Curated annotation (Swiss-Prot):
Biased composition (Basic and acidic residues): 1-12
Skewed-composition ranges (Polar residues): 378-388
Gene Ontology BP terms: negative regulation of circadian rhythm; negative regulation of DNA-templated transcription; rhythmic process
Alphabetical list of InterPro entries matching this protein: CIPC
Stretches the record annotates as Disordered: 1-85, 162-224, 378-399
Highest taxon in the source lineage: Eukaryota
Keyword Ribosomal protein found: no
UniProt name for this protein: CLOCK-interacting pacemaker
Gene Ontology CC terms: cytosol; nucleolus; nucleoplasm; nucleus
Keywords (A to Z) from UniProt: Biological rhythms, Coiled coil, Cytoplasm, Nucleus, Phosphoprotein, Repressor, Transcription, Transcription regulation
Location in the cell: Nucleus; Cytoplasm, Cytosol
Residues with Phosphoserine modification: 213
Length: 399
């Protein structure tokens, strides 16, 4: 058997293997470049895969060192320069070799291929300042004021009309103590009206005998009850010893009251009360009749007999009488009552006259003695009634 010489065949085989390896490397490079070009053309290339080589990184570091920047001081220098140049801006962001593309608004330039949003370029690093939206500073004092306003805000208060009194914040913040003091002040003001009117004129000596031991006469109690009920009592005579209750018929017959009594200090203090009867169209009764003001004043001067509550009632009644007289409502009320009484009396007379007229017509038609007797019987009691009515009307003047 012939043995092959390995020394002769090995260099050829090795050279063939090396040639095949170099060819395969070339083919791989060509395929890689073609794939990269196809990816770039199709638009699906990834920029992150194309990293910088070590040589390019060394070149960028050399350029930064030539500019005076070091690798460790780079963020400090960037922040310092940004703060010095633009104190109001935020720290800058360094983007290496990346160019951000702006999107075109025109629809004609749009294509079917997908375009990348950024492109890797070989140039110096670019600095982009990003401005975050900074909200306006809000002071804490304004927020506190808003909170306090929101607590006191009531939409009902703003709906009041202009003519109505708008309630303020002070009225809402009133405590129970302040409300109590205001009520006490109102009570004091109402109680001061009575003593001021009664003490305006000094009392005459011997006019009203007031002693704690002597009880009040029953006539005074009757006059007081009638005064509290709102019926003006007419006292006959000017002396307080002759107090007499008057019936409601006499009260209704009196068209107005005489305020010229010498024993009434309230009437003496008011000049408008005197001479009222001379100006009124309906002349009242004689001057001997007194007003209910005198009775109220006389009853108010006996504190030992009546309690404080009844005295306050008398004071209020007295003040009411004075106010009604000054405004003229008291005279108007009395005149209205008198007119109502006269109207009722006239209506009764008209009814009687109609009945008598009907009887007279029946008697004339039938000519019967019974009808005439009935007519005569109706006229006999009617004549006495008419006479009494005429006497009642004679006490008062014609209107």
């Amino acid at each position: 058997m012939e043995r092959k010489n390995p020394s002769r065949e090995s260099p050829r085989r090795l050279s063939a293997k090396v040639g095949k390896g170099t060819e395969m490397k070339k083919v791989a490079r060509q395929l890689g470049m073609a794939a990269a070009e196809s990816d770039k053309d199709s638009g699906f290339s990834d920029g992150s895969s194309e990293c910088l080589s070590s040589a390019e990184q060394m070149e960028s570091e050399d350029m930064l060192s030539a500019l005076g920047w070091s690798r460790e001081d780079r963020p400090r220098q960037n922040s310092k320069t940004a703060k010095n140049a633009f104190p109001t801006l935020s720290p800058m962001v360094v983007m290496k070799n990346v160019l951000v593309k702006q999107g075109s608004s025109s629809s004609q330039l749009q294509s079917w291929t997908v375009q990348p949003s950024f492109e890797v370029i070989s140039a110096q690093p670019q600095l982009l300042f990003l401005h975050p939206p900074v909200p306006s500073p809000v002071s804490p004092c304004h927020t506190g004021e808003k909170k306090s306003d929101s607590r006191n805000y009531l939409p009902i208060l703003n709906s009041y009309t202009k003519i109505a009194p708008h309630p303020g914040k002070r009225g809402l913040s009133l405590g129970p103590e302040e409300k109590g003091t205001s009520g006490v002040q109102k009570k004091i003001c109402t109680e001061r009206l009575g003593p001021s009117l009664s003490s305006s004129e000094p009392t005459k000596a011997g006019a009203v005998p007031s002693s704690p031991s002597t009880p009040a006469p029953p006539s005074a109690k009757l006059a007081e009850d009638s005064a509290l009920q709102g019926v003006p009592s007419l006292v006959a005579g000017g002396s307080p010893q002759t107090l007499q209750p008057v019936s409601s018929s006499h009260v209704a017959k009196a068209p107005s009251l005489t305020f010229a009594s010498p024993a009434s200090p309230v009437c003496a203090s008011d000049s408008t009360l005197h001479g009222l009867e001379s100006n009124s169209p309906l002349s009242p009764l004689s001057a001997n009749y007194s007003s209910p003001l005198w009775a109220a004043e006389h009853l108010c001067r006996s504190p030992d007999i009546f309690s404080e509550q009844r005295q306050s009632k008398h004071r209020r009644f007295q003040n009411t009488l004075v106010v009604l007289h000054k405004s003229g409502l008291l005279e108007i009320t009395l005149k209205t009552k008198e007119l109502i009484r006269q109207n009722q009396a006239t209506q009764v007379e008209l009814d009687q006259l109609k009945e008598q007229t009907q009887l007279f017509i029946e008697a004339t038609k039938s000519r019967a003695p019974q009808a005439w007797a009935k007519l005569q019987a109706s006229l006999t009691p009617g004549s006495s009634n008419t006479g009494s009515d005429l006497e009642a009307f004679s006490d008062h003047p014609a209107i």
